[in-house]
Amino acid sequence: MAVVQISRIQHRSGTSDNLPQLARGEIGLAVDTRRVYIGNGGTGSPQTENLELLTSRSNILEISESYTYKDAQIGFNAQTGLNAASPIIRTLQEKIDDVASVRDFGAVGDGETDDTAAINRALYEIFAREQIIRVRRMLYFPAGKYLVTGLLKIPSFAYLKGEGPDSTIIYGNDVTENAVVQFADSKQQVDASVGSGTGLPPQFIVIDGMTIEAGVDIPVLHIDQAESCYINNCKIIGNSASAPTAVGNSNPAVKITSTASYTTKHINFKNCTIGKHSFGVNLDHDMNSIHFDGCNFEHAFKAIKIGENVTGSAPAVTGPKSVKITSSRFNDIYKQGMHAYNGDNIVSAYNIYIDVANNSLGNGNAATHVIDFADGVGSFSIGDSFDRP
């Protein structure tokens, strides 16, 4: 067989920022990024360029500009650009990064691995590291049991989304902590550090579709110095299987507090289960516009305790105002369903109270008031139902 042509074979190596245009068929190695390229051009080629060869070091998601939203199941491809001929094209990496998962940051969710650092890292990187709006996105918690042995600090503007109560579970078991989860400012600072530096106090935090559980006797969710926050379709529980017969360490499932600097206001719970603790909810400090709607309070010494420790000084000058519990269910509560020691405009409306304030002896054994407004003005029970004979 006659030899028609012998082509020159040449390889180059160097750093990626000094990679020249390679000759047609010439191979170049970028030693710093460990990526390999081959030159393309000349007759028959659509353009002169360096093409990357896929290796174990290639970032396929970054280099693949192949995603275009279509939604073909509706019967036609959606138009994403100015016209059908110019669709919006994004890399797969950009598409996947639209939603962040705690597993992207190392959380496992197997109930055995300590996920504290991984979850706090995810919260910091997405919501606290840079105060740029476009960096924020929903933080997704796939179904699993996330063991935490330290305090989870949820910064301002965080949006946490699980796959439903008893499917996504955050489980805290460190008795030395002040809570399993606590709201933090925009720099992930808590307690006396809230608002220091350029930190914005806790605000517009959303938690949706998960269980937050304490396996030890500590508060479960601590909402402190916060404004305009929403907890939807969640279980917030301790570790009591039945209503405690004493206050114990007086820890609540939900603890809401203020300081002299920041008064908590406009906190909304919707369709949540709260209890299995000494108290379901403890509200002592000055605060206003606290609303529980469609919730289930169960297995507690008292379901909701309001304004017991009013001192006349900040942060507990007069106690909570405008606390409303509506369309909710109270069940297996040893003492009062609602006990307002101090506070104005406390309202219970259209709730049902089952086996409440009977010392767990059944509805024919009343021990105290189901609803007790001890002091304050403008407090009412409207349209409530009771199972007492």
Model-derived regions, located:
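N-terminal extracellular ligand-recognition/capping segment immediately after the signal peptide
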Residues: 124-159, 163-175, 211-216
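Right-handed parallel beta-helix/beta-solenoid
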Residues: 13, 62-82, 88-118
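Acidic Gly/Asp/Thr-rich repetitive segments characteristic of extracellular carbohydrate-active
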Residues: 102-140
